[in-house]
Amino acid sequence: MATTQVEIQRPIANFSPSLWGDQFIKNDSGAKAAEKHCKAVEELKKEVMNMITAAESNLVEAMNLIDTLERLGISYHFEKEIDQKLNHFFSLNTDYSDESYDLYTVSLHFRLFRQHGHRISSDIFGRWIDESGKFKEGLKTDGKGLLSLYEASYLRTRGETILDDALEFATATLNSIAPHLESPLSKQVVHALIQPLHYGNPRIEAHNFISIYEENQDKNEFLLKFAKLDYNLLQMLHKEELHEVSRWWKELDLVSKLPYARDRVVECFFWAMGVYHEPQYSRARIMLTKTITMTSIIDDTYDAYGVIEELDIFTEAIERWNIEEMDRLPEYVKPFYKALLELYEQFEEELAEEGRSYAAHYAIESLKELVRSYHVEAKWFIQGYLPPFEEYLKNALITCTYCYHTTTSLLGVESAVEEDFQWLAKKPKMLVAGLLICRVIDDIATYEVEKERGQSATGIESYMRDNNATIEEAVAKFFEIATDAWKDINEECLMPSPYSRDVLMRILNLERIIDVTYKGNEDGYTQPEKVLKPHIIALFVDPIKM
């Protein structure tokens, strides 16, 4: 290139190094311990199956058991049995106006039915509304019931004002009474106010609930033992997978070749594990981790290093998807381009063996779309152009990366058929809602840092200019957009649905990762020390004490 390296002014971001070094490459497989745990879990599974069968005739008892299994993180062993139970119970059309069903029970049943796609009406909460249309004052002493109502309200859809009111009432009251509640309820309330169950990462929530359940006087020691064993067994599997992707990442050696990019392979695996933690998704987790890691480098190349002449060429090279394009590329990005094409060659070979090579095609096309949108953003930055909010959002829904990551989350899922990829390519309502959440929450968390780096074409800036709004008003509007998008996701997860529940759950879980990663308006991916490090240690380093 005519321009020398010295003359190039690059938008360097100076990202912090990895927190983990080679920690996960030095992995003790723990094969003997895993085998021992496996046998114990299989024995305990039989006993739990008996418990599920025994609770057949008692609605309240059975629903409490299902909730406990789900919160302890062991319900995936009994998905078929739980779905059968819930289908049966929902068909009973229980009269929840009966005084024998208290607020805790009604809220719990509502949440469980909604979580599993059943269209139970929010009108069942009407009996707790007074003549002025407010929730009754007497509920303020019912901490357990209010917590159950609070968690249920996060399953609301658009137009359910009774649940909007329920969330406001329960949140305010729980904040007020939390210091006066006894443990473990107080701990559960404090945690829920920070991290609502429906928005949380299932493994993190299971880890937290196991410690809370252990304090419960009414706990079932048998279930507690099962949950701990299973948690540690899954952790062993996840550590093996993390070892594999960490070794792959180290062998690529892109950290030394592209020192400007974020070194976040462990955090990328954390994201993939949040999308699916169950054993049968092992290959899918590894494939998704690799695609997220590579996307992170592309993002940083456009956002934090490349100049427009280089990015023009790189965008064309991705569009043409041909190894011969390497000769045209800037030297620094050649190793990455080669590694990216080779990764997808491996994917295609593996998927072709099971007749699913089309999955790689859809992923590549989605990546091309992402890169085109990154290129648009880069040109805005270079030109100092601040687009109208509508124009910004159209492009930014793609650069949030979730279009691409939802597609690549299905690469290793054998049950995902071509129709699923075609559905995602059409940008259905469920996916768009997910993209909105990812975009606006990311924009809130990264606004100040991007502003410091001279990024003018941000969503917050665009919205403020278009609407003559303050930063506080813009942030409030973005949270409102996210809240409405969550309502749309909840609606789209309800039955009947023509779409695969397996695919819907991938989108839902991707949004949960956003809620966790950007908790407290922090960018936990770029700066993982505060937000993600404690979770990663709990999930992949320290086993639960038996």
UniProtKB/Swiss-Prot annotation:
InterPro entries: Isoprenoid_synthase_dom_sf, Terpene_cyclase-like_1_C, Terpene_cyclase_plant_C1, Terpene_synth_N, Terpene_synth_N_sf, Terpene_synthase-like, Terpene_synthase_metal-bd, Terpenoid_cyclase/PrenylTrfase. Mg(2+) 2 binds at residues 299, 303. Pathway: Secondary metabolite biosynthesis; terpenoid biosynthesis. Induction: Induced by abscisic acid (ABA). GO terms for biological process: diterpenoid biosynthetic process; sesquiterpenoid biosynthetic process. Keywords: Lyase, Magnesium, Metal-binding. Its EC number is 4.2.3.199. It comes from the Eukaryota. Pfam families: Terpene_synth, Terpene_synth_C. Highly expressed in flowers and at lower levels in leaves. The Asp-Asp-Xaa-Xaa-Asp/Glu (DDXXD/E) motif is important for the catalytic activity, presumably through binding to Mg(2+). Sesquiterpene synthase that catalyzes the conversion of farnesyl diphosphate to (-)-5-epi-eremophilene. Monomer. This is (-)-5-epieremophilene synthase STPS3. It comes from Salvia miltiorrhiza.
